[in-house]
Swiss-Prot record:
<feature type="transmembrane region" description="Helical">
    <location>
        <begin position="31"/>
        <end position="51"/>
    </location>
</feature>
<dbReference type="Pfam" id="PF01040">
    <property type="entry name" value="UbiA"/>
</dbReference>
<dbReference type="GO" id="GO:0016765">
    <property type="term" value="F:transferase activity, transferring alkyl or aryl (other than methyl) groups"/>
</dbReference>
<feature type="transmembrane region" description="Helical">
    <location>
        <begin position="222"/>
        <end position="242"/>
    </location>
</feature>
<protein>
    <recommendedName>
        <fullName>Lycopene elongase/hydratase</fullName>
        <ecNumber>2.5.1.150</ecNumber>
    </recommendedName>
</protein>
<dbReference type="GO" id="GO:0016117">
    <property type="term" value="P:carotenoid biosynthetic process"/>
</dbReference>
<feature type="transmembrane region" description="Helical">
    <location>
        <begin position="243"/>
        <end position="263"/>
    </location>
</feature>
<keyword id="KW-1133">Transmembrane helix</keyword>
<comment type="pathway">
    <text>Carotenoid biosynthesis.</text>
</comment>
<feature type="transmembrane region" description="Helical">
    <location>
        <begin position="53"/>
        <end position="73"/>
    </location>
</feature>
<keyword id="KW-0472">Membrane</keyword>
<dbReference type="InterPro" id="IPR000537">
    <property type="entry name" value="UbiA_prenyltransferase"/>
</dbReference>
<keyword id="KW-0125">Carotenoid biosynthesis</keyword>
<feature type="transmembrane region" description="Helical">
    <location>
        <begin position="115"/>
        <end position="135"/>
    </location>
</feature>
<dbReference type="GO" id="GO:0005886">
    <property type="term" value="C:plasma membrane"/>
</dbReference>
<keyword id="KW-0808">Transferase</keyword>
<feature type="transmembrane region" description="Helical">
    <location>
        <begin position="160"/>
        <end position="180"/>
    </location>
</feature>
């Protein structure tokens, strides 16, 4: 499992027994850039120069979606999955913390979500719509009455929430939506990424009586579903720029590599934050090159 800079935080942050240490671990440091990264990409493509790239609003959005946004997203998930997580090996092996039923934690999770509403004071209308959509999907993915995560295919579709911070970041700078092909392509990518990450949870979810896209399709067919999502994402991104379409082909290629070499999916899953960080960095570097050199 590759080490990310965020992985080193566990050695320096307060112990899990403290409230701050627990909250930081609940926010999944290894996955911080899953929300914060799209902000960087969105802002990079919207900005006309370094001034906009490092504007106070852009920085505030990145900081929010890196930590408080993750506390909100994963906090809601852990609160409503407390019983199910008893069967989750990710909790048993210490890679993720288990919800401890602390009222202070619940209050902070709610406050982390409410904090996002402050951006409504400065975002354009489209940015506000995207922000509200992100908040709604973050809650209803895990919480009743919709609880998308327990409905095959809706769990996958709803995980487009991960790309909405990028839409918000783009709208915050440009005032309009990013290209539709970029949004649809990124949404399809997120669908594949979410479902791929659910493969290690197939047996625990079945034991807990949870229906997901992965439990419904089974492991073999889930690989094909992910490949389909990523091939479609590459195809759609091609209409934004062919380079983006080519870049996205790394994902179906990795699936065939995993199957061909026989890599344990439980191990491969933990490589993807690093892979996604590298791909996101390439997207960002392309934007910066265009910004600086045309």
């Amino acid at each position: 499992m590759p080490e990310l800079p965020t992985d080193r935080l566990t050695a320096v942050i307060p112990p899990e027994e403290t409230l701050l240490g627990y909250l930081l671990r609940l926010s999944r440091p290894r996955f911080w850039l899953y929300l914060g990264g799209p902000v960087i990409v969105g802002v990079s493509y919207a900005a006309d120069g370094p001034g906009e790239l490092f504007s106070p609003l852009a920085i505030a959005l990145f900081l929010y979606f890196t930590i408080p946004g993750n506390v909100f997203l994963y906090g809601v998930n852990d609160i409503f999955d407390a019983d199910i997580d008893e069967h989750n090996p990710k909790k048993d092996d210490g890679r993720e913390v288990s919800y401890r039923g602390d009222s202070a934690v619940t209050a902070i999770v709610v406050a982390s979500g409410a904090l996002a509403l402050l951006f409504a004071l400065v975002l354009p209308t489209l940015g506000i719509v995207a922000l509200l959509a992100w908040m709604a999907l973050s809650v209803e993915y895990s919480a009743p009455p919709l609880r998308f995560k327990t409905t095959p295919f809706l769990d996958s579709i709803s995980n487009g929430l991960y790309i909405l911070p990028g839409v918000i970041g783009y709208a915050a700078i440009e005032g309009v939506a990013p290209p539709a092909t970029a949004v649809v392509g990124a949404w399809l990518w997120a669908m594949g990424m979410h479902t791929f990450s659910a493969i290690p949870d197939i047996e625990p979810d079945r034991e807990a009586g949870i229906q997901t896209t992965a439990t419904f399709l089974g492991e073999s067919n889930t690989y094909y579903y992910c490949v389909m999502c990523w091939l479609m994402a590459a195809f759609v991104f091609n209409f934004t720029h062919w380079v983006f379409g080519v870049l996205l082909l790394v994902y179906p290629g990795l699936v065939f590599g995993i199957l061909g070499v026989g890599v344990d999916i439980d191990e491969a899953y933990w490589w993807y934050p690093a892979i996604n960080t590298v791909v996101g960095m390439v997207f960002t570097l392309i934007a910066l090159w265009v910004m600086l050199y045309g």
